[in-house]
Amino acid sequence: MAKVEKKKFTKEYRLKEIQRNLTKKARLKKEYLKVLKDEGYSIPEKPQYEKHDRSSVEAKKALNKQKVRDQREEHKLRKRTQKEKEQSFKEQEMKRIQLSKEKQVERDRRAKKLTQRTKRGQPVMGPKINDLLDKINSDETYTR
């Protein structure tokens, strides 16, 4: 008494199920309309489908094609602007890196001058005084 298991995941089974459901719905609708007629109610008319003329269909297709073209153009424009932004960002980053390297070289040069020592180990005061004078000259509070 073992049941034969149906293979629910096969294409044939699904097609049979769809066909079975369609015939069941058609039979139920027919019975419903027959009962309505027997009880004296008016039977609803079948909906009339509008026939579309070719010009309106072609116009819709043309409109859709135009929309697709517009979307593609917009996408290309967005990509182009994004690439330009990335390029400008890279250029700014390179400038910033170059500027920081130049500042670091200047700091190293200045530090080397300020840490100079005589033969006996005493600090050389000339570069320190010159550095302080340069700072005063470059500061805008002391210049008029």
UniProtKB/Swiss-Prot annotation:
Region Disordered, residue ranges: 42-144
Biased composition (Basic and acidic residues): 47-76, 83-109, 131-144
Cysteines engaged in disulfide bonds, as pairs: none
Bias type Basic residues, positions: 110-120
Pfam families (UniProt xref): rRNA_processing
InterPro entries linked: Fyv7/TAP26, Fyv7_fungi
Major location (coarse): nucleus
Keywords from the named record: Coiled coil, Nucleus, rRNA processing
Chain coiled-coil ranges: 64-104
Keyword Glycoprotein attached: no
Gene Ontology biological-process entries: rRNA processing
GO CC annotations, alphabetized: nucleolus
Localization per record: Nucleus, Nucleolus
Family stated for the protein in its record: Belongs to the FYV7 family.
Function: Involved in the processing of the 20S pre-rRNA.
Protein name: rRNA-processing protein FYV7
Provenance organism: Kluyveromyces lactis (strain ATCC 8585 / CBS 2359 / DSM 70799 / NBRC 1267 / NRRL Y-1140 / WM37)
Lineage: Eukaryota, Fungi, Dikarya, Ascomycota, Saccharomycotina
